[in-house]
Amino acid sequence: MGNTVGAPIVSEYLEDEIGPIVFKKSLGNARFLKTVKAYHSEEGYVVVKIYKKRNTKESLEKYKIMLKEIKDNFNITPSFNIMPYQHFIETDRSGYLIRQYFHNNLYDRLSTRPFLSMIEKKFIAFQLLKALEQSSFKGVFHGDIKSENVLVTTSNWVYLSDFACYKPTFIPEDNPADFSFYFDTSGRRTCYIAPERFYETNRGAPSNNELTPKMDIFSLGCVIAELFLDGFPIFDFSQLLSYRKGEYSPEPIIRQRIQDPNIQTLILHMIQKDPDQRYTPEKYISKWNTVFPQYFSFAHQFIPELMRLENDDRVMCISDKFDEIVDIFKNNSITNLFKSNLNQSTNSNTIGSFRVSTPSSPILISNNNNNNNNNNNNNNNNNNNNNNNNNNNNNNNNNQTTTTTTNTNINTTQQQQQQQQQQQQQLQRPLSKLDDIGKNIANIIYKTEQFVKESDEFDKTDITNIKELNIQTTPTINTSTINRVIQTSKTNTNLDTINENSNNNIGVNRKKVTVVEGLDLFLSVIYTAVKHCQFPSTKVKCVGSLLVRLAEMLDDECRLQKIVPYIMSMISPEQPTLVRVEALRSLAKVLEMVQTFPPSESSIFGQYILPSLSQLSHESTDEIIRIAFAEILPQLATTAKRFLEIAQHYRDPDSEGIMESRKDRAKFRVYDSDLQEVQDQFFNKVSDLLTKDSCNTLKKIILSDIYRLCVFFGRQKTNESVLPLIITFLNDRDWQLRCAFFENIVAVCTVVGAGSLESFIYPCILLALTDEEEFVTEKALSSLSELCSLGLLRKPILLELLVKTSPMLLHPNNWIRYGVVSLIVKICQSLSKADVYCYVKPKLSPFLVNLNGNGNGNAEISDTITESNLIQLLDSPISRESFNKIVKFIARNRINLSSSINSILANDNDNFNGESFNSNGSGGGGNPNLVSSTGGSNRRLRALSNKFFVPNILSASNSSINSTSGDIGSLLSQSTEESLAFLRQMTSIGISDSDQNKIIKCFDYLQSKKCKDLESANNSEGNVIVIRTNGTTIISSSNNSNNNTLSSSTTSSNSTTPTNSTVNLHSVLNNTTIIQQQQQQLQQTITQQSITQQQQQQQQQQQVSGGITTGGTTTTTLGRSSSPQLTGLNPSILSNSNNIQLSSSVVDVTKLPNSIPIRMVKIRGGDQSLNNSTVSLGSVAGGNIITPSTSLSNSNTMVGNNNNNSYNTSTSSSPLSSSVLNSSVGMNNLTNSNANSINNSSGINNNNSNNNSVNSNNYNNMNNNTMNNSVNLMNSNQIGQQQQQNPNTVKIDLVSPSDLNVVSKKYYIRDPKMGLSTILKVETNVECSIKVPLPLPDLGSTDSVLGGGLLSSGGVGGGVGGTGGGNINGVSGINGNVGGGGGGVGVGTVGSGGNGSIGGGNSGINNGSGGGGVNSGGNSGINSGSTNSSGSLYGNGNGLDNLPNSTWRPMGILVSHFFEHKAAVNEIQVSSDNLFFATASNDGTVKIWDCQRMEKSVTNRARQTYAQQEGRITSISICEKTHSIASASDKGSIHVFRVGISGKQKNGNIKYTNLSTVKNITETTRGNIVSVSHYSTNSSSVVTYATTKGGIHGWDLRSQQDAFNLVNDASLGLIQAFLIDPNRNWLVTGTSRGFLTCWDLRFGIPLYSVRVSNGRILKFAPYMLAKSASESWVYISTEQDNVIVFDLSNKKTTRVFKRSYEQPPQQQPQQPQPPQQQQQQQSQMNRSINMTSSTTTTTTSSYDFGTENLKTSSYSQLPSNPLVNSIVNNSNINNNNNNNDNSNNVTIFKPTPLVRALLNPPNCPFLITAGDDKRIKLWDWNNLPQSYYVSIGKEPPPFYTHKFSNDTSNAYEIHEEVWHDTSSSSFYSNSAMFGGGGGGQPMSTSLSSSSLSQQQHQAQLQLQYQLQQQQQQQQYINHLQQQKSKTSISMPTVHHQEPILDIKMMEVPNPMLISASTDGVVKVWK
């Protein structure tokens, strides 16, 4: 190219000379080739090197050929590491070299973070040698290898580029100009040219001017040396010349700076001066195998194939094959693994079949592989000899892997088999032994203790007197659970799961994983793929799983330098939420793995990580991210402190904490300041999360691991900051948050010390003992037990706890009782024996069981108090019912009787110390014993209980209580009046005697117990049911939500009972008029409350409320008292009655208005009760949710009182649900066997028999979706049964979005030695792995019929009609067979056409002959058996190709007449393949008719009849692309049934089998169904229906659930019709008030409502003109205007089709016709009339669309001709003119008939209407005068004209038919005047005097024409009469005699109309 300097390059030249390339910027300052970066519109960024020619004569053709050869060589066989120039262009001025642009070259990459690791440098050197090997193999040599020409991608893949074949091979050594111009492009003066390429000037250049591979080896050696020297070049130009002369050597630098001696020798060998001593690239790779391990070859082949996949597939492939890749890199051997994978993927018989097992499954080797293994061993001998060292080193590693590899000797195989058998035995060994469990738990506790000790050592804090620290360190380990497992064996917890979770979560003794070298090569590949992933799930899997697994096998430097920064980038706000969550968790795991790091990384938390995470604690961050951040905070804090301690150890590894000098103190000051800074940062994060966030879940997460945070903050900061922050959680209403506080507070106590424990934490625990939620109380007791076991409580506090908690031994909750027992045992263990005897035993004695039945004494406790002994001696607890009553009673009335109760319990001999009941705990003088074990006070207390607490005490006055016992009298004399009133009140509210005694013992605890339901009880006074029975009125209030029973007690006339528990009890005992006041207040409340529709509906559904059965017949009675008395009873007061008998004969139930809700049941005593509108089951601790049953309750229920005081409102009670036993909801109900419950069938079940639940079925109104669908909750064992009875019961989510995987891919790694082009095989499986919704029920698809035998295998249609021939009855003009002509369905040839058809001959209509007819019958068959686009069975023959089109018109020829229906036929539907059509009738049947039989004969019968549906069938719809029909009944039911078609009969007719029901949908509550429709999508098959209550509902047949529920506005009127868009985008409804509502089906919202008519909207029809601009147009049949065309998009009317009367204009008198002519015309008319035979058809129609008032009468049937239009009778005109000469022109309103049927055939520019006038009219809107009557109906219409006009004000067209018969009063006239059948053209303008004569002449011609047609028609009628006389069948009428309700069109065998009327008649017309 010459040693010339190029002229300056102008950037504009670029686009002018080489096309669409835009200059971006210059690259470098080279003089020989100017390099620029440019942008190509199609290829992206490119590099263009420009050579500026010196003159235009200079030619570059030689170099162009060389560059093209290089390009072609590498393009034929793709090379992985070569990037040649892609394009070379030569112009007159320049030459251009173009290749792809890369962001980095090797020189730039060496100075870019993250820096290359040693293994990455080796892999780059390996790729460079491979690139040189590839180019040498092609005979191509580079000539200028340097770091600038080595391109590096983001995945660290290397390309060798810029082949310099155009540069000189040899340059002079004494002239640096050539070197600077050609080779020193970067200006660094680095020189990597081989020494032999320099020559002395005096000797001249060598004659051989070609490059050799040895030259490139030297240059590559220099590049590899620069790579390992981190960018330091070993030669510049002067040094290379000195090295050539032997004056300089780079060996010292290489030996000093490169640590690996193998790399040193490799570089020194490659840069030898003698080229003959240099090796080839492949020999360097094989000889230096220690530098280039064997897995490099695998990675070099695997990574390029991986890069060809999509980004998501790359990540999935690495993740799926991660274990195999690890094995390859770990063992440095890939051959055996490749063979295993190859066998698995190809199923080869010559290699052996192995199943590669997962780590959790054993390895199996098939027996038929022995011979193959021998062959493999023989074949592998050579490899073993060559790689003995490697094989020996890798045997141990192979034995430890879980993937099967083929070994080289039999011994190794036997060892593996033995090891596999041992693994199988270990996997099959049970792990449920108690000894193993104890060891596992002990291991957990030991690890926890080790963690605590290490943390305390870090904090320089010693915790004394801690022998066993059973605290929770992770969220999954619960100390109470561990203790419960060790002490008892009653729990069902999976201990293996606990052990597994504990091992996974404790990171102190984490199992070390061996570092696998080389895996970091995939990090860059993964990062590049994840950056451009399409699916967030791929990122989640990569960040959450793949990177963590890689981090476990990489070194610490790689974790900190490469993995942590990338994970931090995935936490940025630009990433999806789930990706950020997984990134946070992975960050904590990876940082915890780091054990060693340089000192500079010690501040990574304070300077990098925490500032980057600062935005996560902000309120705007997603809640799930904040929760994940709170979850990892303790882990991050512990890791941060460990980093600081490791850094401190590096600063002074020998001091061991002894600060002897200033230097040491300075080091520690650095540590303290760094720790303080990090602590402040972490506390700010914790404070922001806890104070700025109201999410309780986040607070629970922090509490679950609060101990590690406390250890991190230290004692001082925990006391000052953390403890006050978490104590505020106790003020929260969420009881689960309070539970979490007490679950984890013990660990905090170990950090804060005894002072903070007694001052702050202990009082909070005492308050929790009386918490309203019993879960909290149980957790508080557990925390006290832990504190006692740790020895953190002093003796006075222990004694105080004994006093406070001993009364709780009588608590009805077993969990609380067991917690108190555990606490007392721990207290006893901390006290001496003397203290136990003096303090503990007296305190416990009153709560022990009474061994002597006469009350002589309680049980005596042994000296050693254990949990088992104490539980056995405890007295039975207070019943749950009594406990709830007394707690609410005390809280509501604020009773404080502590001193009075103590005085009752006191006596002279053995004093009960009052201090035992006081809240100040122990202390004070006196005997601390509560009761002596054998003292007499116990007997007195028993006597007091037996004699004082009796029901008769209520009848006595307060001052006159008599007793026969002197002891009782003395006790009563000491009691106060207030205490006596309290005792009476306990009896009055229904507390038993035994419970009263226990209540007195634990009164102090009950007095301080909080009552959660107090507020709700006070607000429920209005929930009352009034019952009158025999003059006695009982008002029952349901304010007790825990006990919803309703009972009564017999009361005497002199006794009074409280009416409401909110009233003061003293006033209740002395005032009997409170009930009247309550009634007045109740009436006022009722008048103020509004009754909503939802509450009213739900109230009607509830049949049982509080034990009272209401409804149509009430069967509940109450016991009658002796005298009429008004008594108000609380349900809790009534529960103690003994004589309750219910009978329907004596009860008058007055139910209060529905606005007063009646509480039914409560799942848990502390929760809000369930109301009537919704059932909201909150989350519980156990995770199980109790759902009420849906079993129906009996309408007649007997309620009685048994011995257990339980009321059973069904014949049998259900057993306890096993799921409830494991639920935390049952904790409140773990009480004794005394039960007061109501059980309705099977439903809500508590844990034992002592439950206060109401099991009812009145939970049917839970809203499970946005459509307010009524869904019943049911138990899991009842779902199947209930769904069979009522399939609409439960909405089940059948398909989860996460399961809808589109494809699944499997990846296989194959052996590269097999000679395959790729080693990565990807199998994509779409069919087997797609998870779709439930299959659609068998609806009889039309496609299945095609393969079922209806068509021949060749697809050629047969002839149904057969050949024509013969005349019918010899009548001329009707030639051919009636059914002849037209091919049909079946095997055979296309049937030949007959000689014409009906109406043929010389009629002038269709002069067809031979193959003629209406539609050339011979061509109407199947054309080659193909199907049309609409899914029809019929082919694209001429008969269907032209159907329907703009030229087709119905002729009005009657083909068939059916009269099988006994009532009105409401709707007709034709199947999509035109095999059959169906009719729905008011007689409750749906009949199926065969379309193929229509032209065979007039008399046909229905093929099938469906009569299994109740009520009238109002609408039907044929399911799309199926043979199933959806029929709707006025009873609110929809049946979907399948029409069975099983093939073809011998005569060619289709064979119909039985009908089968597919689905029954019963929606009686939604109203009568007006119309039904069906549509299908790719994922659903929806039956849509509208009801009279304004609902539009969709039921999905595939998922068996509601697809949508829409509600039309009731103010718009009742829905009369609806129509669905064929594209499923919109839906329109029409109402009785003329309103049209358009709905958007995609979003389920109403778009608008507009009034289109003042009358009713009767029907919709789609506008079917193809490819019109009016796709949103619809036809609407209305009352006022017969038919309008409405544009839904513009909300306006575009056309109107109407009929009206018009007053005739004034006309000149006409000359009368001669009498002879009048008589002649009249005689002709009479003859034409007499030619017809009249039939009478009468019926009683009950059709509900407005035809109930239509009169049915006998009338004469007139003949008709379809093409003769209405004509005028001249005599009639004259008579009208004569009669109207002297009359006044008065316009009288005359009603027009309603249009009830609309039809717009596809692609036809006309509309067909029918309705109350019994006529079928065709409206041609393109040519209105061409409109005519297809059927003239019962009587001919009068004279009419067509009128077209434009309404300019409303902008729509009016197509009007104007009637001029002024003598007729309405369209329902019974005159016998003949008006014409329809063959002629009607008058298109109104009459005028100037055109009267012309009209008369036209009328005469039309009359003659009509008479001729009537003669031909009469011949056909005569033929039918003859057939009638032969078959004794009544002659059918030609036209409809009743209003027509529907018309449809079928296309096969010929296009024909189907019409149906209210008398049940169905007619088919040509």
Curated annotation (Swiss-Prot):
Q: Which GO terms describe its molecular function?
A: ATP binding; protein serine kinase activity; protein serine/threonine kinase activity
GO annotation (BP), single: pexophagy
UniProt cross-references to Pfam families, sorted A to Z: Pkinase, VPS15-like_hel, WD40
Q: Which reaction is catalysed here?
A: L-seryl-[protein] + ATP = O-phospho-L-seryl-[protein] + ADP + H(+); L-threonyl-[protein] + ATP = O-phospho-L-threonyl-[protein] + ADP + H(+)
Q: Where is this region: Disordered?
A: 362-407, 916-937, 1036-1062, 1106-1130, 1190-1263, 1699-1743
Q: Which residues belong to any copy of the Protein kinase domain?
A: 21-303
Q: What is its EC number?
A: 2.7.11.1
Each WD repeat occupies one of these ranges, namely 1460-1499, 1508-1547, 1564-1605, 1610-1649, 1790-1829, 1935-1966
The Low complexity compositionally biased stretches are 367-407, 1106-1119, 1192-1263, 1703-1722, 1732-1742
Q: Which superkingdom does the taxonomy of this entry point to? A: Eukaryota
The name under which this protein is listed is Probable serine/threonine-protein kinase vps15
Annotated residues for binding of ATP: 27-35, 49
User: Which residues catalyse the reaction?
Assistant: 144
Question: What is stated as this protein's family in its record?
Answer: Belongs to the protein kinase superfamily. Ser/Thr protein kinase family.
InterPro entries recorded: ARM-like, ARM-type_fold, HEAT_type_2, Kinase-like_dom_sf, Prot_kinase_dom, Ser/Thr_kinase_AS, Vps15-like, VPS15-like_hel
Q: Where are the HEAT repeats?
A: 558-596, 604-642, 717-754, 756-793
Q: What's in the keyword line of the UniProt record?
A: ATP-binding, Kinase, Nucleotide-binding, Repeat, Serine/threonine-protein kinase, Transferase, WD repeat
GO CC, any one term:
late endosome
**Which PROSITE patterns does the UniProt entry name for this protein?**
HEAT_REPEAT, PROTEIN_KINASE_DOM, PROTEIN_KINASE_ST, WD_REPEATS_2, WD_REPEATS_REGION
State the encoding gene.
vps15
